[in-house]
Amino acid sequence: MKKVLFYLLLFICSFSTATFAQSYRRVSEKEALYIAQKQFTGKDVDYSTSSGIIPENDTIPLSIRQADVANRLSMRYPFRSNNADEVREQPVYLNVTTTAAGQLAEKVGDDINNVDSLIVNGPINDTDFYTLWSGTFYGRLSVINLENAEIINGVIPEWAFCRPKEQVIDGYIYSIGLRRIIFPEGLKVIGKSAFNFVDNLKYINIPTSLQRIESSAFTLCWLLKTNPLVFPEGFEKLEERAFMNCSELKGSVVLPSTIKEIGALAFYSSKITSINFPEGLEEIGNEAFRGCRFKEVVISNPNIIWSGESQFGYNFKLEKISLPEEMTYIPPRFLEYCIELKDFRIPSDVKVIKSGAFNECYNLQKLELPAGLEEIEDQAFSKCNALEEIVFPASLKTLGAESCTNWTNIKRIYSMAAESPVCKVNMNSGATPFYSPNDSDPGTPNDIPVYVPTGTAEKYRNTKGWDYFTNFIETDDFPTSTINDINIEQQESKQGIYDMSGRKVTTTEKGKVYIINGKKVFIDNNSH
C-alpha cells in the first residue's frame, strides 16, 4: 500500500513558495481534510457539514458504503507491492453494460474490488464514478475503459477520482491505483480536481469532443506521460493548475485554433518541450508555463492578456522567444531564471518592462531595448551577468531599484536621454538601480564608461543612482541597432519604409520605430 505523508505532499505541490519542514506531526482527519481541500482549491472549507464538493453518503451505493474503512483498506492491492507496475500474473477484467445511469454498482457487485481492468458500456453518472473510484481505492482496479460509455451531460464530475474525505486517514493521504483510463467520444468537460493526486496515472486520451479541462483536473499526476498531448478543435479553456506538477509530462503540446484561455499554473513544473500558441489565444495566466522545458516560444497575438507573473519563468532550456511588436509591456518576472537565453530584442511598442522580468538570466549577452521605452521596474535585469553593453533609449524616464545590479561583465553603458532617468531607491535597503547592499562581489562596476548626451554629464553626476558611476563621457555618437533580425531582402530594405515585423508601409506613426532606407528610425513626428 502506497502511503504518502500528507505534509510531504503539500511541500511537493507548492515547492516554489514553501520551506521544507524538518519534522512532521499527525493531524486529525478533519484537520487533514481541511488542509488538503485548501491546498487543492485555494479556499477555506468547513468539513463540519458537507460542502457539496465531496459526495454525500446518500449518493454512494449502499453495497459500497456498508463496508467499514479498515476492512476495505485491507483489501487494497493484495496482489501488488508498493510499485503500481508490479501486477499479478493473471489480471482479471470485467466487461459490464448498463442500461441506465446509476446501475454500475449493481452490475459489478463485489467484483469491483477484485478486477484489474473494467470495460463499461452504456450510460453512467456521478454515482457510477464513485463506484469506479471505489474500485481503484479499495480494490485492484487500475485500468478503466469508457470508450463505449455514455457519460451523462458529457461531464466527468468534480473530484471523481480524488476524494480527500475518504483518502485522508489518520493524517496520511492514500493514493489510488488507477494507471490508465480511456475516455469516450462525447466527453465535453473534465471536472475540477477529477484526477487530482492520481499519482499512478500514466496514460489518457483526449477525445475530439472535449471542450474544457477544469481547475486541478490532473494536478500531481506525476507519472502522466501522454506525448504528444493534442487538444481538439473546439477545445476552448484549460483552467488553472490543470496539469500542475505533472513532472513526467514531456514532449509536445498541440493547441487548437479555438483555444481562448490557459489558466494560472496550468503546466507549472511539467517538462513539456514544445507548444504552439494560436492567434486566437486571449489569455495566459500566472506562472502558466513556469518550470517547463521549452527551447523556443513564438507568440503572435498582440492582444493576449498576461495575468499575474512569471508565465515562462524558470524555463532552463529556453533559448529563443519571439513576441509581437505591438506588446506594450513585458509582464513581471516573465522570463526570470531562463538561464539559456542569450539574445533578446524587446518588441518595438513596449513602454514598460515590469519588475523582475529578466531577473537572473545569467547568460543574456545581447539585449536590444526599443526606442520609446519609458520605464524599467525593480530588478528587471538584476543578475544578467553576461551583459557587456546596453543602450538606454532617449525615451527612458525611470529605472527601478536593483534593476541593473550584478552586471559583473558590463563594459560600457549608453544613456541617450537628455534628462537623466529617475532612479528609484528601495527605502528599506537603500538599493538603487545599479547598487544593492546584497550585491555579490564585485557587483556592477562603477568605473566603466557611461556615455551620455553632450552637455549632460554634470546632470547625471548629480542624480541619485547615477552618482554611483565615476566615469561619464559626453558624446553625440550613440550606437544604432542592427536590422539583421528583420526579415527583409537587403535590396528592398534600402528602398522603402517597413515596420518592425518586416511589412512594407506607406505611412508612419509618431512614437514608433521603422526601417527607413535600411536603418532603424524612431519617429518623433509625422515627417515621413
Residue spans of the language-model regions?
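C-terminal tail/sorting-segment detector
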Residues: V513-H528
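Structural signature of tandem-repeat unit edges
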Residues: Q90-T98, D116-I124, L141-G154, E166-V189, ...
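Bacterial Sec-dependent N-terminal signal peptides
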Residues: M1-R25
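Residue-level detector of functionally pivotal "anchor" positions at catalytic/ligand-binding pockets or at interdomain
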Residues: D476-K504
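Consensus positions within tandem repeat domains that build extended binding/scaffold surfaces
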Residues: W159, G191-A194, E214-A217, E240-A242, ...
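Low-complexity, Pro/Thr/Ser/Gly/Ala-rich linker/spacer regions in secreted
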Residues: R72, R76-N95, E474-N487
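Short, T/G/N/S-enriched strand-turn elements that build extracellular solenoid repeat scaffolds
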Residues: G102-D111, T127-T136, A160, S193, ...
